[in-house]
């Protein structure tokens, strides 16, 4: 990288704090949803008498949904915008989370799990993108920890 001429101040890379705080809040929400969602739903299913095999099969839907959602996130965000895609993912995650509470039919928890974890994966990918876009390269290590 070339050095600026002597006497010329080096460019200052500013961090846009409101955007960075929002992006970190988003990734924090993703961490809470994954960290609490997987074990809590398994405990609820166990309390309802669901076999451990079916609980494991239902939990596997999270991984499948995550792989599928990660594959389509960039294209979706490109077509509809990052903010709109994130808002849709938040809406889908919230509706499916409520579905776990109100829907007692175990078999309907499979599509709920796919929607919930697919939406959470979209939020994860776009939050990471947002953090990387907001933090200047020279400070990215500081921001990401």
Give the predicted meaning of each segment.
Residues 14-63:
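Helix-loop boundary and gating motifs at the non-cytosolic
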Residues 69-81:
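Helix-to-loop junctions at the C-terminal end of transmembrane segments
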Residues 34, 115-127:
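Core transmembrane helices of Major Facilitator Superfamily
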Residues 41, 122-135:
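Intracellular juxtamembrane helix-capping segments at the cytosolic ends
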Residues 81, 102-107:
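Helix-breaking motifs and short loop linkers at transmembrane-helix boundaries and internal kinks
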Residues 23, 105-113:
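Short hydrophobic/alpha-helical segments at membrane-entry points of transmembrane helices
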Residues 84-99:
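Structural signature of the two symmetry-related core transmembrane helices
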């Amino acid at each position: 990288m070339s050095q600026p001429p002597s006497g010329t101040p080096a460019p200052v890379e500013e961090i846009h704090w409101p955007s960075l705080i929002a992006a970190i809040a988003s990734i924090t929400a993703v961490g809470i949803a994954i960290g609490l969602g997987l074990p809590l739903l398994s405990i609820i299913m166990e309390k309802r008498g669901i076999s451990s095999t079916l609980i494991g099969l239902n939990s596997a839907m999270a991984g499948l949904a995550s792989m599928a959602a990660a594959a389509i996130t960039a294209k979706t965000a490109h077509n509809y915008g990052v903010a709109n895609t994130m808002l849709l993912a938040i809406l889908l995650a919230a509706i499916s989370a409520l579905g776990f509470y109100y829907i007692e039919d175990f078999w309907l928890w499979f599509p709920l799990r796919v929607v919930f974890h697919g939406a959470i994966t979209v939020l994860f990918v776009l939050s990471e993108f947002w953090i990387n876009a907001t933090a200047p390269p020279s400070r990215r290590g500081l921001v990401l920890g």
